[in-house]
Amino acid sequence: MSFNIWWLILYFSIVCQAKAHYSLRDFKANIFQVKYQWKYFDYNFGSDEKRQAAIQSGEYNYKNNVPIDVDRWNGKTFVTILRNDGVPSSLNVISNKIGNGGPLLEPYPNWSWAKNQNCSGITSVYRIAIDEWDRLWVLDNGISGETSVCPSQIVVFDLKNSKLLKQVKIPHDIAINSTTGKRNVVTPIVQSFDYNNTWVYIADVEGYALIIYNNADDSFQRLTSSTFVYDPRYTKYTINDESFSLQDGILGMALSHKTQNLYYSAMSSHNLNYVNTKQFTQGKFQANDIQYQGASDILWTQASAKAISETGALFFGLVSDTALGCWNENRPLKRRNIEIVAKNNDTLQFISGIKIIKQISSNIYERQNNEYIWIVSNKYQKIANGDLNFNEVNFRILNAPVNQLIRYTRCENPKTNFFSIFL
């Protein structure tokens, strides 16, 4: 084969790849499957009598149950519900029973933890994390509605037997912004080097801080940075022509196991930032010496929850776009390298939770590229404005294969896909 013919073949291959990129990207949302959906949330109370008693006492009010996060382990699907009046349980699993609103929830690990007498149980959980040691890390902010009722805490369960492994209260001076008196820990990111050498990075969305927990000695440190604070230009959110306002700081975070970069952004901003966690885990560090990096105004809307794949594809909800965006950390952090990989004005209204979960297959040919992205969407604009229609589907859990979402996009790793460098 002559040199010119080889280049001609290469040229047409690149053109075909590029055309596939632009024709397929519009159909990425169809890759997502709705795994669960609800008009409203209800619970398996054990009997109709107990359910009616919960309604009459005000323990349960279907209008006040808002989902935030999802995670999966060994066939169990976890869902978190923000604690408020009428929310009987914040940490739950989806049962196989169906109610009028959708699948019924069951408290995890049991109802006694949901009752939370004398702050011995669980108050309110935004997000959770599961590590490679089959441990469920629960970040409890201790807030019900707008009221602080219990200390913030980390609760760890052994998923193999649902037994408590650890329950650690976050010290008051760590959990709270000493200037404003505000606190709201919302996102835990777990970094496990081994069973004991485990670190947890915690976002304080209202106190504008990153809290670091060392599992080995139960120590905490609170860090502050201008990158954790909201941008006043971007406190207004608009989804499907409906607006609301938030002054939210650091919220969505994701940890790359290859680079050990912790990616994050203040929710009410258009920024994307990161900090390398080796600064925290490899010896003592001084807060003033921490190097925070990233790009300001790189996004065109606010970004919500985040998760990162093994190949370095960082996913994040794009709020006003009702879309899922991504960027591969093996590419320069430039706007041209950020893609929308799925968009749907109905099913992707405010992505509040994202996880990337490996799906084990018995087929040897499917054991690679077996990562699935799981997301929660909750129509937060209607929650904020109090105009949810409980006669229609409001809340969804969806999933999709990561490799199919990023195929023929700039979110593919350029080191492993030759043609992606031309996209």
Swiss-Prot record:
Tissues of expression: Expressed at very low levels in the hypopharyngeal glands of adult worker bees (at protein level); expression peaks at 12 days post eclosion. Secreted into bee venom in the sting apparatus (at protein level). Expressed in the brains of adult worker bees peaking at 12 days post eclosion (at protein level). Expressed in the spermatheca of adult queen bees (at protein level); expression levels are higher in mated queens than in virgin queens. Along with Mrjp8 expressed at very low levels in the head of worker bees compared to other major royal jelly proteins.
Expression induction: Unlike many other major royal jelly proteins, not down-regulated by the ecdysteroid 20-hydroxyecdysone (ecdysterone or 20E).
Superkingdom field: Eukaryota
Span of the signal peptide: 1-20
Key words of the record: Glycoprotein, Secreted, Signal
Record-linked SUPFAM superfamilies: NHL repeat (SSF101898)
Gene3D superfamilies linked: TolB, C-terminal domain
InterPro entries xref list: 6-blade_b-propeller_TolB-like (IPR011042), Royal_jelly/protein_yellow (IPR017996)
Transmembrane stretches, start-end: none
GO cellular component, one term: extracellular region
Protein localization: Secreted
Glycan-carrying positions: N110, N118, N177, N196, N345
Cysteine disulfide links: none
Record flagged with keyword Glycoprotein: yes
A Pfam family the protein falls into: MRJP
PANTHER family: GH10609P-RELATED, PROTEIN YELLOW-RELATED
Record's function text: Component of bee sting venom. Component of royal jelly, a substance produced in the hypopharyngeal gland containing proteins, free amino acids, fatty acids, sugars and other nutrients, which is fed to developing larvae by worker nurse bees; may be present only at trace levels. All larvae are fed some royal jelly (also known as worker jelly) early in their development but it forms the principal source of nutrition for larvae destined to become queen bees.
Family label: Belongs to the major royal jelly protein family.
Protein name as annotated: Major royal jelly protein 9
